[in-house]
């Protein structure tokens, strides 16, 4: 039977991507050494950001070495991991004759490690050659254990990784790679490792989770197997983020955010993302600002922009966010979702806009170092910057999943409000 082209959905065939084996819960990090030994690790490259001196790296290194596994440390990963971080780590891996990788930290550590694995498997080719879908030709790359110290990334459970191309600093580019060869061998999420995460960082990472859950729920992919996890992760964030921020040793809150992170990662792994992430990638490409913070500032603006295309789904998000929508119309409930997101961001101390962001608000994140030294001291809202960010959004791999059509012209007011506007 012939099918008219206009009868075919945007994504008629959808693909479900696998998850790694995972250890979730209190005390999971205690057995990292045993797990590394059982996986056959002999000499491992440990990749991390600024966590050295926090006690976490020292503790986990001790557990690994106790099982007879040698550790080579690469602790120069920057936030929004750069191409040169990946290439340096891959070179060190070869130089030190390592046989495996362990990443400890958030998405930056995990994504840099994924990138290093790809480079190692392809004889040192430049990581920027692997942007996009399934670019690996050699799927046999080093085994990888990812240990999360934040509830945000979801990288430890997904097939995606994000790298910043710094080859042209006049036109920096933050890109996404989707490759099942980079799925980690083992993910470890232990809420005890979140206790020392600073308040503001907990808030930023929590909004990363909210974006990871909400975007596949309204995505143009409309991938049914992801919808339940997506909605439940939003509910968990609304329930636990405030307590996790203001009561950092509240185990129930930290565990709730751990679960939210993991299942949101499962949701977007196949359900896709949207322009909350596209805006975030663009802003950090130019200014090296924190990914979770970028998501937090962009999210209410994007929800408002997308409402006309997904009123019913946003109304359901309002309920997940704790809003009593029983006496509201669908449109009113959808509007209430945006208001709930704004209220949550204000409650946990998210800046109103990007112009209020300052680099000195970060600690142990390796922001604005290397080629980005001084870039994020002020996020500019001039016409040139707004246009550059809006154009970057157009080329982002997350943009096609957005439920509402996106153009440069339609993004200029959204980006402008995110930089200078207030609610």
UniProtKB/Swiss-Prot annotation:
It comes from the Bacteria. Disruption phenotype: Cells lacking this gene do not grow on methanol. SUPFAM superfamilies: Dehydroquinate synthase-like (SSF56796). InterPro entries: ADH_Fe/GldA, ADH_Fe_C, Alcohol_dehydrogenase_Fe, NDMA_methanol_DH. GO terms for biological process: methanol oxidation. Induction: Constitutively expressed, with a significant increase of induction in the presence of methanol. NCBIfam families: NDMA_methanol. Catalyzes the oxidation of methanol to yield formaldehyde. While the in vivo electron acceptor is not known, N,N-dimethyl-4-nitrosoaniline (NDMA) can serve this function in vitro and is reduced to 4-(hydroxylamino)-N,N-dimethylaniline. It is also able to use ethanol and formaldehyde with an activity comparable to methanol, and has a weak activity with methylamine as substrate. This is Methanol:N,N-dimethyl-4-nitrosoaniline oxidoreductase.
